[in-house]
Curated annotation (Swiss-Prot):
NCBIfam families per record: PRK00094.1-2, PRK00094.1-4
EC identifiers of the protein: 1.1.1.94
Record's function text: Catalyzes the reduction of the glycolytic intermediate dihydroxyacetone phosphate (DHAP) to sn-glycerol 3-phosphate (G3P), the key precursor for phospholipid synthesis.
Protein name: Glycerol-3-phosphate dehydrogenase [NAD(P)+] 2
Family: Belongs to the NAD-dependent glycerol-3-phosphate dehydrogenase family.
Gene coding for it: gpsA2
Domain of life assignment: Bacteria
GO molecular function terms noted in the UniProt entry: glycerol-3-phosphate dehydrogenase [NAD(P)+] activity; NAD binding
Keywords assigned: Cytoplasm, Lipid biosynthesis, Lipid metabolism, NAD, NADP, Nucleotide-binding, Oxidoreductase, Phospholipid biosynthesis, Phospholipid metabolism
Residues given in the record as NADPH binding sites: W16, R36, R37, K110, A144, R259, V282, E284
Organism: Mycobacterium tuberculosis (strain ATCC 25618 / H37Rv)
Active site, per annotation: K195 (proton acceptor)
Location of this chain's protein in the cell: Cytoplasm
């Protein structure tokens, strides 16, 4: 892997972290995959499978799993951070003393931190003291299970340092996974953080039996919300019209493999938040709707779909009531 260390640390053995570890290995890299639970690491090393998070995907022998963060980070000049958005800070506080100086730190998480309203790249910089050019983001229409099956996919590698971006691009470029570079870190992160919320809304609509017209309206108006927020934060609108915006939004809103859409469907069918949560791994949109709405409010950006999802998830509003609320809004030009 020209331009990048032969060993890359992937911190987080969930579905997405494991899938990207496989991509890196398939592209010719040596990968150390950190798992929070020792039994997950042991299972990966002994069976080459991660049935808890990515069942059915045979992992290459060039992936070594460990539950020891010091072992995972030792000597790695590139660190992919695959933990949930709301645990990013706590994990980084533990790992910061172990991070090699000058390492490229790559966020895989899609969310806005509660309380601080920081994007993940901002959290990374805040905790580690890294310079902004050291921090990159990978985001796009990347359903982990499809990538693990080697189905063709594309993604965005966003970094203000073009050299680091190209090095990551080369490291990830396999026969089935095509990365594109982009200097717009803000737009790439906002697209990834917001699309999960819109996918929840799409799932809710499907869950109560609504059709394609409704889904198309949700996706399109959801994109308008994402663009409004992104541009208010300084994002390039073209980024949000690309893989990290429209691409990720369409995949997450339309695929039955999407956790956020599936969770929304359960809510639409009348399940409680707690009941739906038992059937799904981490669903970032449930938390992100709160932090994204607060961020939008601080910039005076209107996000009615996000507000409706927030009310359903956190304020006790029913899905039917949310639809009535949205349809009752004042009419205006598109």
């Amino acid at each position: 892997m020209a331009g990048i260390a032969s060993t890359v640390a992937v911190m987080g053995a969930g579905a997405w972290g494991t899938a990207l570890a496989k991509v890196l290995a398939d592209a010719g890299g040596e990968v150390t995959l950190w798992a929070r639970r020792a039994e997950v690491a042991d299972q990966i090393n002994t069976t080459r499978y991660n049935p808890d998070y990515l069942p059915g995907a045979l992992l290459p022998p060039s992936i070594h799993a460990t539950a020891d963060a010091e072992e995972a980070l030792g000597g790695a000049s590139t660190v992919l951070l695959g933990v949930p958005a709301q645990t990013m800070r706590a994990n980084l506080e533990r790992w910061a003393p172990l991070l090699p100086e000058g390492a490229t730190l790559v966020s895989l998480a899609k969310g806005i931190e509660l309380g601080t309203l920081m994007r993940m790249s901002q959290v990374i910089i805040s905790v580690t003291g890294a310079e902004p050019p050291q921090v990159a983001v990978i985001s796009g229409p990347n359903l982990a299970s499809e990538i693990a099956e080697c189905q063709p996919a594309a993604t965005v590698v966003a970094c203000s340092d073009s050299g680091r971006a190209v090095a990551l691009q080369r490291a990830l470029n396999s026969g089935y996974f095509r990365p594109y570079t982009n200097a717009d870190v803000v737009g790439t992160e906002i697209g990834g953080a917001c699309k999960n919320i819109i996918a929840l809304a799409c799932g809710m609509a499907v869950g109560i039996g609504l059709g394609e017209n409704t889904a198309a309206a949700i996706i399109t108006r959801g994109l308008a919300e994402i663009i409004r927020l992104g541009t208010a934060l300084g994002a390039n609108g073209a980024t949000l019209a690309g893989l990290a915006g429209v691409g990720d939004l369409v995949a997450t809103c339309t695929s039955p493999r999407s956790r956020n859409r599936s969770f929304g469907e359960r809510l639409g069918r009348g399940e409680t938040l707690q009941s739906a949560g038992k059937a799904c791994h981490v669903v970032e949109g449930v938390t992100s709707c709160e932090s994204v709405l607060a961020l939008a409010s601080s910039y005076d950006v209107e996000m009615p779909l996000t507000d409706a999802v927030h009310r359903v998830c956190h304020k006790g509003l029913s899905v039917d009531e949310a639809i009535t609320l949205l349809l009752g809004r004042r009419t205006k030009p598109e």
